[in-house]
């Protein structure tokens, strides 16, 4: 028998309207799209846009935990367990893309890094990535210190950017 239903799939709902507003994100930066990010149709490729989300969350993590990507000194080891991207509009080169980043949720051993991409104030995509804190034997609880740092960049209502 062939399964025709969606019982075995996982999808993400459309993003909340507040996610489409740059002023909901506590961390904002600009990045230029590269010529090589274009596909054959002249659009910025979806993989290139995902790389911009990845860069925004990496920049946020590094600002919160400066040694996180230094394997010799890091005290935290994060791994991605889930990544949901919504591509909402086309983008073209050349473009300056404003990235927004923040924390969407804090769990026991993980948190959701939430990012948005904006061109001329219009949201072209959002991404939610579940990052899990790992120890030697698997996931470990987030410390109070880590939780406090993450709380400083929780997504929130308009910040007046």
Positions of PLM-derived features:
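A broad, structural micro-motif
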Residues: 44, 78-80, 124
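Small beta-barrel nucleic-acid-binding modules, principally OB-folds
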Residues: 74-90
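Short Pro/Gly-enriched beta-strand edge/turn motifs at strand-loop
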Residues: 81, 95-98
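Catalytic strand-loop segment that frames the active site of acyl-thioester-processing enzymes
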Residues: 8-63
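HotDog/MaoC-like acyl-thioester-processing domains
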Residues: 1-24, 29, 87, 91-96, ...
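Short, surface-exposed acidic-centric catalytic microdomains
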Residues: 63-69
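Hydrophobic, proline/glycine-rich low-complexity stretches
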Residues: 61, 73, 158-161
